[in-house]
């Protein structure tokens, strides 16, 4: 019988997305379903989201959740063809912005909003009329990280929990006095459970209570065990190390495919013929107001403009390389720290028709950026996985990335000290640290490689042919989920056998005949529950 999964998250493309989390949730769910694993996504009913589902309808009412009563809606997203459960409470979710308002300020009740989401997951795990129970609740990031604790404290022993850490830097920290409003049991309001640095910490609760903890790359799984990358939770993570594993993300290779990308219109292309990629560069140059020069090397950046993403380093490194290579251009798409936005926008004044920065993000623009670029610059002080370099590689845009987290796992670079011919086996370039010199040297190295067309073409082919699909990635999740359920089944069978032996012994002592094939009543009830959970969540 297939293991049924309830995926609990704050984002899922295309219904709600601010970054890579939304892409990862959708890609994972689709791949699991394609492999025969029933999976449903539980998501807040943000403004306008319910209208995007086909035949959205109420399946349950949830009373006394944090933030008030809510409805549970079910439906299918027509574009992704994925089943969703939406937690509807307009007082919590019907507003502009997922996490921040129109002025970029965090919603002051974010703790309440996502505590409600975790409580809804626990209620589903416990059982709601007409709604099959999942075998595993898979919580993602701090927004859903209370769910494992709530499931454990509710005594729901036959539903297992997994927490996936997409970014440990965001932990969901809130005042201690909010614990009651968040529905955190009194027994869990201490340093042993949910409190760190005199604040409630949702991520700490998830790490401590989940049956398994995963993160999104092998390198990041090792990094977060250290003080440099553990964001203060490395001690707890080291305690949970036997239950911690890195499972690399995948990408949606249908959505990110230059041969059928609707955002490219008639300029779609494939690895065997890159003629249209050159035309995509012309389109991008025109869009950003750059000189339309087919021989220019166009470096693109598409990310949050923050210190984590080394936007501060890029603002200093790019002018050095622009001065050294007059044929280099830069196109930047992103938003973030206003100071860093200004520093990058200033490059357009210093280098007119060679540099341009567009503040904001839109999906179509991101696709055109990867299609039109020659090189992706993606520095990062820490990077749990790094989806953007993989998108770039799909489009034959060679990435330059920091040697951290997932990029250390996915970008293959023999190194600057190897013979030039060794780069024929590379799919990108890596640099170490967050120094301006390191980034500038990596850019210079890429500009030098561009002068060797056959070598560069080999790197493009390598990048475009590397398999980063969710079908490759999801097998490890499937094995993990199945092992949790099989372990529960084994424990249940052992309990049934023990109960049966005890029953037989008691009957024999009383001189009664016992049919050895008849199990005790309590295990039988457990078996019926298991059978009832064998199908997909209703939609």
Regions found by a protein language model. Give the residues of each.
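Catalytic cores of nucleotide-sugar-dependent glycosyltransferases that transfer UDP/GDP/TDP-activated
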Residues: 1-505, 512-539
């Amino acid at each position: 019988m297939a293991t049924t999964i309830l995926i609990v998250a704050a984002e899922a493309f295309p219904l709600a997305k601010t970054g890579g989390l939304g892409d990862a949730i959708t890609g994972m769910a689709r791949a699991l379903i394609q492999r025969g694993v029933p999976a449903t996504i539980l998501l807040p009913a943000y403004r306008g989201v319910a209208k995007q589902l086909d035949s959205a309808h109420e399946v349950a009412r949830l009373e006394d959740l944090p933030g008030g009563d809510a409805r549970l809606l079910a439906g299918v997203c027509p574009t992704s063809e994925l089943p969703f459960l939406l937690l509807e409470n307009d007082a919590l979710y019907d507003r502009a912005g997922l996490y921040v308002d129109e002025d970029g300020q965090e919603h002051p009740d974010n703790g309440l909003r996502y505590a409600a989401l975790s409580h809804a997951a626990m209620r589903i795990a416990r059982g709601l009329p007409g709604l099959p129970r999942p075998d595993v609740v898979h919580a993602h990031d701090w927004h859903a990280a209370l769910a494992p604790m709530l499931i454990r404290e509710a005594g729901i022993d036959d539903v297992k929990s997994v927490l996936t850490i997409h970014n440990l830097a965001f932990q969901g920290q809130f005042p201690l006095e909010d614990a009651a409003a968040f529905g955190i049991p009194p027994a869990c309001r201490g340093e042993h459970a949910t409190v760190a640095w005199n604040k409630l910490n949702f991520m700490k609760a998830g790490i401590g209570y989940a049956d398994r903890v995963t993160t999104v790359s092998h390198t990041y799984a090792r990094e977060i065990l250290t003080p440099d990358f553990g964001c203060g939770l490395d001690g707890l993570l080291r305690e949970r190390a036997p239950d911690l594993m890195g499972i690399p993300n995948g990408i949606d290779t249908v959505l990110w495919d230059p041969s059928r990308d609707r955002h490219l219109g008639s300029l779609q292309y494939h690895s065997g013929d890159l003629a249209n990629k050159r035309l995509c560069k012309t389109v991008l140059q025109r869009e950003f107001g750059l000189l339309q020069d087919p021989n220019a090397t166009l470096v693109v950046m598409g990310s949050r403009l923050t210190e984590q993403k080394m936007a501060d380093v890029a603002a200093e490194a790019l002018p050095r390389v622009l001065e050294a290579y007059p044929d280099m251009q830069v196109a930047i798409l992103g938003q973030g720290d206003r100071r860093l936005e200004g520093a990058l926008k200033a490059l357009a004044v210093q280098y007119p028709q060679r540099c341009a920065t567009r503040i904001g993000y839109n999906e179509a623009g991101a696709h055109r950026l990867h299609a039109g670029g020659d090189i992706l610059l993606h520095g990062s002080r820490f990077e749990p996985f790094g989806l953007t370099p993989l998108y770039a590689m799909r489009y034959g845009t060679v990435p330059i990335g920091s040697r951290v987290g997932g990029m250390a796992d996915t970008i293959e670079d023999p190194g600057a000290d190897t013979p030039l011919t060794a780069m024929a086996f590379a799919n990108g370039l890596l640099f170490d640290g967050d120094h301006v010199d390191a980034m500038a040297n990596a850019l210079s190295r890429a500009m030098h490689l561009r002068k060797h067309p056959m070598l560069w073409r080999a790197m493009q082919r390598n990048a475009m042919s590397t398999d980063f699909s969710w079908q490759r990635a999801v097998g490890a999740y499937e094995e993990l989920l199945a092992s949790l359920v099989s372990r529960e089944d084994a424990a249940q069978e052992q309990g049934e056998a023990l109960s049966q032996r005890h029953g037989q012994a008691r009957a024999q002592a009383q001189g009664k005949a016992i049919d050895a094939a008849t199990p005790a009543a309590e295990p039988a009830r457990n078996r019926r529950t298991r059978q009832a959970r064998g199908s997909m969540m209703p939609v």
